[in-house]
Amino acid sequence: MKILILACLVALALAREKEELNVSSETVESLSSNEPDSSSEESITHINKEKLQKFKHEGQQQREVERQDKISRFVQPQPVVYPYAEPVPYAVVPQSILPLAQPPILPFLQPEIMEVSQAKETILPKRKVMPFLKSPIVPFSERQILNPTNGENLRLPVHLIQPFMHQVPQSLLQTLMLPSQPVLSPPQSKVAPFPQPVVPYPQRDTPVQAFLLYQDPRLGPTGELDPATQPIVAVHNPVIV
């Protein structure tokens, strides 16, 4: 901006000089026409001297302005640096200003985590524990010792057998009759037997094997005991550890 201002000032000065030269030439012509030659020469020399002085003065002013512009370009104001001043790490908040209440941010499950949990469930399904079958046991007061040699001891009271007569058909009883062969004990395994709970009364959803315990003994044609009245070995449900 300063350079443009200086250029404008120089142009104005040159224009003024041209005007003055034109005026001086006109005055010289007028004087030469009116006065003798000696006076015209003196006036011309005087005018030329004044013009030279003005031109020199304007040239000096322009040089001074250019020097100041160059100095101002190189010399720029630098920020004041305090050697012992430490920067403030945080903005100082006045005490009158209260912090704004922010809404609580709740964690949410990403869809990738949900897919991983579902894949684990499909790969490693949970084991279903099979319930143990409850075998009915006759109370100790009504229990009788079963002896194949004594037919009277094998007979049980009728009120214990009546609730099971209408549940199991005779066709099932005939197909599920045990053979007359001696019952072999199952091979012993390392699994410890699970004790069966004692039920003081017979249940309706009892298996057919339990029903055979309450059946009346019947004598065959040869006078021997029917195989259904043979004692049944108690079945233990193994527990897998």
Curated annotation (Swiss-Prot):
Question: What is the first-listed, main subcellular location in coarse terms?
Answer: secreted
Post-translational note: There are at least five different forms found in milk, with varying degrees of phosphorylation. These include form 3-P which is phosphorylated at three sites that have not been determined, this form is present in very low amounts, form 4-P which is phosphorylated at four sites, form 5-P which is phosphorylated at five sites, form 6-P which is phosphorylated at six sites, and form 7-P which is phosphorylated at seven sites.
Which sequence positions carry the modification called Deamidated asparagine? N150
Q: Signal peptide span per the entry?
A: 1-15
The free-text tissue note of the record is:
Mammary gland specific. Secreted in milk.
Q: Which GO terms describe its biological process?
A: lactation
Q: Which UniProt keywords apply?
A: Milk protein, Phosphoprotein, Secreted, Signal
Q: Name one GO cellular component term.
A: extracellular space
Q: Does the keyword Mitochondrion apply?
A: no
Q: From the Swiss-Prot or TrEMBL record, what is one GO molecular function term? A: cysteine-type endopeptidase inhibitor activity
- Stretch list, region Disordered: 21-45
* Alphabetized InterPro entries for the sequence: Casein, Casein_beta, Casein_CS
Which residues are tagged with the site Not phosphorylated?
S30, S32
User: Can the keyword Secreted be found in this entry's annotation?
Assistant: yes
Q: Which residues carry this modification: Phosphothreonine?
A: T27
- Tell me where it resides: Secreted
* Residues with PTM Phosphoserine: S24, S25, S30, S32, S33, S38, S39, S40
Q: Per the similarity annotation, which family is this?
A: Belongs to the beta-casein family.
Entries under PANTHER family matching the protein: BETA CASEIN (PTHR11500), BETA-CASEIN (PTHR11500:SF0)
This molecule's function is given as: Important role in determination of the surface properties of the casein micelles.
In Swiss-Prot or TrEMBL terms, this protein is called Beta-casein
The organism is Equus caballus (Horse)
